[in-house]
UniProtKB/Swiss-Prot annotation:
InterPro entries: ArchSynthase1/Queuine_TRR (IPR050076), TGT (IPR004803), TGT-like_sf (IPR036511), tRNA_ribo_trans-like (IPR002616). SUPFAM superfamilies: tRNA-guanine transglycosylase. The keyword Transferase applies. The active site is at D94, D268. GO terms for molecular function: metal ion binding; tRNA-guanosine(34) queuine transglycosylase activity. Binds 1 zinc ion per subunit. Its EC number is 2.4.2.29. Catalyzes the base-exchange of a guanine (G) residue with the queuine precursor 7-aminomethyl-7-deazaguanine (PreQ1) at position 34 (anticodon wobble position) in tRNAs with GU(N) anticodons (tRNA-Asp, -Asn, -His and -Tyr). Catalysis occurs through a double-displacement mechanism. The nucleophile active site attacks the C1' of nucleotide 34 to detach the guanine base from the RNA, forming a covalent enzyme-RNA intermediate. The proton acceptor active site deprotonates the incoming PreQ1, allowing a nucleophilic attack on the C1' of the ribose to form the product. It comes from Staphylococcus epidermidis (strain ATCC 35984 / DSM 28319 / BCRC 17069 / CCUG 31568 / BM 3577 / RP62A). GO terms for cellular component: cytosol. This is Queuine tRNA-ribosyltransferase. Keywords: Glycosyltransferase, Metal-binding, Queuosine biosynthesis, Transferase, tRNA processing, Zinc. The lineage of its organism: Bacteria, Bacillati, Bacillota, Bacilli, Bacillales. PANTHER family: QUEUINE TRNA-RIBOSYLTRANSFERASE.
Amino acid sequence: MPAVTYEHIKTCKQSGARLGIVHTPHGSFETPMFMPVGTKATVKTMSPEELRNIEAKIILGNTYHLWLQPGNDIIKHAGGLHKFMNWDGPILTDSGGFQVFSLSNLRKISEEGVEFRHHTNGSKLFLSPEKSMQIQNDLGSDIMMAFDECPPMPAEYDYVKDSIERTTRWAARCLKAHQRPGDQALFGIIQGGEYKDLREQSAKELVSLDFPGYAIGGLSVGEPKPVMYDMVEHTEQFMPKDKPRYLMGVGSPDALIECSIRGMDMFDCVLPTRIARNGTCMTSNGRLVVKNAKYADDLRPLDEQCDCYTCQHYTRAYIRHLVKAEETFGIRLTTIHNLHFLLKLMEDIRQAIREDRLLDFKDEFFEQYGLNVENPKNF
């Protein structure tokens, strides 16, 4: 039996969205689920206890960054990532591919792997499917990701076709190199840019390799949201119904709802933590930039409908003061709030699926959030 399995609970009669449970060696979580990103073995400014308090069930670690610092050997010596960072819930690690491909001017792709330069000191490094598997096996995450090529968007058709075929060959090498299938599940990543036939080809090739779960990669990289939704809707039909489906890099509230409707189970994004660090908050009524002068004497919480630690105890005026003064506590408070907001949104999505009313929920949320206008405020 694979290390990670998907249990289907129900399908929303109104929208077709899925309610399920993903079972892992470090516990189970209901889906659809948002996963906070802990790039360097920490969700920035948050303790594991605080993550548990806001009902985070699974978090991400970043293979590329942890390989370079502190090194996978040190984390292996500590007993794996769970022990190293004191998180006893499920962990998903990416393959390192996305980081390497975002260094586009510093890298060279071959069939063997990718040669690139260190993003800070310029030293030469090489990452291959086998190396990515070795690092992730050392990290000991519950869910590992296959090493894929993430083509830019837009890109020429022939380039993307070559790229997805290489990704399939690399995926087969990942399966062969993976040393711990009993306690770590390896997911395949479907690519294909904005070409529907290539998305279909990539999905079918990877499904034939029989991974225990599948991700859609290469979206949410700057393309218009309707293009992303179209690609997700098209690709979903070729993904197994009895395995988890992970949409990589998506974390805006509207996209989480839209892509849950389109059959996705798992999402991750640095968005809530990144915008929190410059004082931008997600609220029931849309985006709130707490640094703005109008909040200087505003004694209301960030969101009057929110019951997170921040909103229970602190005012907009105080948080604005902290952020303006560059006090770390301000960033902690906005991060707690944003992550709580998204995790609560996912809980509301799951409840709406239970009640067969996710499309109604979407309309209500969009109306209040300010997304039904001609040019909605975006993150």
